[in-house]
């Protein structure tokens, strides 16, 4: 199963988009990717089983590093179709992706 998706290849329609930035990083930012729901990565066990099993799940953190990697590992281990955006929200913006106020 693929682990990542390039920002320029991502089409948001039909995807379940999750912001997994750490709380401190999310609080320091005024923006998010449209349609994203924030889930605290430190509470993964509390919300992982609530995710839809019939949709592709796309995650992002700040730069597509350790946070996204760890969450994708955990979700894929549960059989979910999860990937993360290469470069995180910063890569998304650099590729011309839209952001909105959170």
Where are these regions (language model features)?
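Rhodanese-like catalytic fold shared by cysteine-dependent sulfurtransferases
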Residues: 1-16, 20-58, 63-102
């Amino acid at each position: 199963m693929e682990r990542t998706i390039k920002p320029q290849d991502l089409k948001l329609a039909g995807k379940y988009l999750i912001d997994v930035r750490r709380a401190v990083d999310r609080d320091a930012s005024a923006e998010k990717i449209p349609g994203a729901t924030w889930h605290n990565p430190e509470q993964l066990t509390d919300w992982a089983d609530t995710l839809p099993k019939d949709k592709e799940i796309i995650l992002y953190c700040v730069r597509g590093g350790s946070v996204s990697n760890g969450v994708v590992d955990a979700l894929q281990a549960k059989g979910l179709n999860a990937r993360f955006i290469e470069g995180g929200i910063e890569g998304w913006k650099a590729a011309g992706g839209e952001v909105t106020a959170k």
